């Protein structure tokens, strides 16, 4: 499970089932689970903007899509400076109407969407056949861009806001409650990837009035008890605390969710019996933390509320 997002208008949770190329929905009213969208173009991260429209990061098509309230779909971004995106991973909305998203290489993995063409960073030996299991007419392509973060302006212009040199392999992304800080997770390489690769850190930037970022620094190296806990999805609560999912692999007891103060102090942990990929706050009062793990969804009521669109 990946990319959980809460619809306050529909009072449901949706998430991505990447390997099965579909999105799922859980209804709060009756607890019913159903297929929400299939195919999903191997979507990963999802969220909702301030108008209640779903935003989705698609691996297969290497694009960011917005689903309008009338049911139509709008492609927000699929390239930068004439080059195709890698595999948009996570996305958040800003009150000014812009969208900010990460573009790491993970969709180039065999199990997550579109493997690189022969010679690409995720298929350097050229032994993987990217066409197997894909739609008719599918044309594989090599990675064309570094792993960056972008901002989609309300006009439709796509701007680079965080480069690979600053945050390699960016993954989770979120704003502080006042939108004056941007948090970006830098994760490690995927299996067989020969790209830059992050080191499992979380970075924070100041956001200026002109949407320019400054004062970028490491927020946390995400090491607890000497164990590198592998951050992935990230969200802030209304108090500015930072909640982050944890993929510690075989380090039993370190998978789940961690909560950090705005100063980077560890406040607490939620331990799960499996790897946690992403999180979101939801429920009618937005005080319930939903956790998308490798094979399950978990939820816990908290004493705070998630920041972001109501």
Name the predicted role of every residue range.
Residues 8-9, 19, 28-29, 50, ...:
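Short, ordered coil/turn segments that flank beta-strands lining enzyme active or ligand-binding pockets
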């Amino acid at each position: 499970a990946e990319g959980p997002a809460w619809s306050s208008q529909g009072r449901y949770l949706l998430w991505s089932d990447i390997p099965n190329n579909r999105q799922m929905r859980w209804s709060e009213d009756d607890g019913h689970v159903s297929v929400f969208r299939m195919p999903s173009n191997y979507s990963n991260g999802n969220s909702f903007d301030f108008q209640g429209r779903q935003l989705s990061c698609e691996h297969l098509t290497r694009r960011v899509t917005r689903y309008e309230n009338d049911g139509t779909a709008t492609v927000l971004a699929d390239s930068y400076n004439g080059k195709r995106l890698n595999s948009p991973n996570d996305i958040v909305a800003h009150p000014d109407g812009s969208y900010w998203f990460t573009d790491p290489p993970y969709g180039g993995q065999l199990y997550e969407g579109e493997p690189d063409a022969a010679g690409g960073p995720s298929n350097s030996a050229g032994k993987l056949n990217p066409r197997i299991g894909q739609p008719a007419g599918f044309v594989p392509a090599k990675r064309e861009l570094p792993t960056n973060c972008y901002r989609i302006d309300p006009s439709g212009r796509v701007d680079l806001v965080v480069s690979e040199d600053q945050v390699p392999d960016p993954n989770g992304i979120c704003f502080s409650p006042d939108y004056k800080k941007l948090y970006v997770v830098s994760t490690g390489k995927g299996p067989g990837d020969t790209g830059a690769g992050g080191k499992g850190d979380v970075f924070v930037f100041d956001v200026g009035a002109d949407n320019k970022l400054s004062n970028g620094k490491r927020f946390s190296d995400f090491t607890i008890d000497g164990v590198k806990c592998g951050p992935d999805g990230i969200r802030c609560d209304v108090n500015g605390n930072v909640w982050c999912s944890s993929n510690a692999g075989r380090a039993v007891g370190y998978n789940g969710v961690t909560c950090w103060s705005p100063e980077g102090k560890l406040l607490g942990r939620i331990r799960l019996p499996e790897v946690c990929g992403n999180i979101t706050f939801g429920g009618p009062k937005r005080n319930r933390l939903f956790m998308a793990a490798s094979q399950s969804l978990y939820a816990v009521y908290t004493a705070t509320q998630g920041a972001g669109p109501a």
